[in-house]
Amino acid sequence: HLLAALGCDTLAFGAETPDAAALLDAAQLLLSGEINALIRKKLATGMTYAAARADAAETLRPGMGTLLRTPNNILGIEYCKAILAQGAALTPLALPRLGAAHGGGAGEHGGTPMASASYLRVLPLPEWTSFVPAGAAALYAKAAAEGLLLDSAKFEVAVLTQLRMQPPENFAQLRGISEGLENRLAASVRQADGLDDLYTRLKTKRYPHARLRRLVLDAALQFPAELPMPPYLHVLGARKSALPRLKYAALPAGTALAELVQVGPQAAEIGRLHSRAVDFSSLCREKIQ
């Protein structure tokens, strides 16, 4: 939505299978509706949702199930689904993921050390220097010195505090809530002694950890299920030479959020939620901002 409004014509992303046409075909199948009944049938046998969807796709389109079993392909297919659903004038460009697999350890490509983001997150910051550009490493070191990095203990307490302070009925209004998961969440937040424990208590075959983590953060931030599309383009950074392009954008664009939220009621609502998330983030850093 935002990229199309900005006038972008290509969406590039990494994929284990760098075949944009195949990923678009998979997206069309998932949007068609013909796969849903088969997914439900396979779920009834005890399969996880991810496995049921991949298996159903393989049944309907031999060879397509493989695309739905690898994480970057899955994300790329979601991008393609959004392009198709919105009728956006964007062409997907799938680039091969090389050197290190999603969620994997360190690797290399062409002699250059590579690492997944999840691998980097568990490394001490000084050990990042082999895997990131020198300029980026300097910025990370500066952020660490200023206490801007996440304090996981503060984050955990902040999330659990927000969840325990809310009435259970709030959870029914979250996006992605179904099948009574709001009741499970309401009970689990009273019993969990940490976020990992909470995710474990919530996990079912239909809801993988990644989805549950998003759900829990939505609940902590009190983000409702129904949100308008952002009615503005908030520019966080750009080359000076590129700024004139903003005048051709299909939505109001600028660097000052205080001005953008005055566009209308929807802009004010999105801006309010944005500010809430920024405040929450500021409390979860090594040095509270």
Predicted features and spans:
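Active-site cores that bind ATP or allylic diphosphates and position pyrophosphate for catalysis
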Residues: A4-Q289
